[in-house]
A protein has these predicted regions:
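Active-site groove signature of glycoside hydrolases
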Residues: 1-8
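Substrate-binding groove of N-acetylhexosamine-processing glycoside hydrolases
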Residues: 8-167
Length: 167
């Protein structure tokens, strides 16, 4: 990549490239949603700083578990680095990387715990992954995870949602 000014610092490089994408999207009447894809705190900070400098309205979307999808990884502590921009929380509620939604699994505690944590950051919304490579959980037992997430989002009783699903 040949930049006009090769002396840009890390924040300025992210800002320069993302700014081009942001301006292009705006010119086309579209909205840019950015993903930090950072596993090192310093990188996350510099990326969110660059995004903030471009536009405080640009949506930052990131996973609710830190680094990647896993039932054993911690919640995303980097959310606290997002100061100005709205947050879209990305969730995996069908086991995209641990069973493709094929293995029967109920993620009640995982969904409830991560949802409660994310609500501390007043997210603009949630994006839930519900399939992988054509596999999805609609119409089988794993649809329960969609119903649990739906109950969380709507402030309904999770136990009642589970009971209704299995009734």
């Amino acid at each position: 990549l040949n930049l006009k000014n090769q002396k840009l610092n890390k924040v300025e490089r992210v800002q320069y490239i993302t700014g081009i994408l942001h301006d292009t999207c705006r010119a086309l009447g579209k909205e840019l949603v950015v993903r930090p894809f950072a596993s090192i705190e310093e990188d996350y900070e510099l990326m969110t700083q660059a995004y903030e400098q471009i536009s405080g309205e640009m949506l930052i979307m990131d996973k609710w578990t830190q680094f990647d999808w896993s039932l054993t990884l911690p919640v995303n502590a980097f959310f606290r680095k997002i100061k100005r921009n709205p947050l879209l929380v990305e969730t995996d509620i069908f086991g995209e990387y641990f069973g493709l939604g094929i293995l029967p699994i109920m993620l009640r505690e995982h969904i409830q715990r991560n949802f409660a944590y994310c609500e501390n950051f007043d997210p603009a919304g949630y994006v839930s992954r519900i399939d992988r490579a054509g596999y999805h959980a609609f119409g089988d037992v794993n649809e329960i995870n969609y119903r649990i997430m739906e109950a969380c989002l709507e402030g309904h009783d999770i136990d009642l949602a589970i009971d209704a699903f299995f009734a």
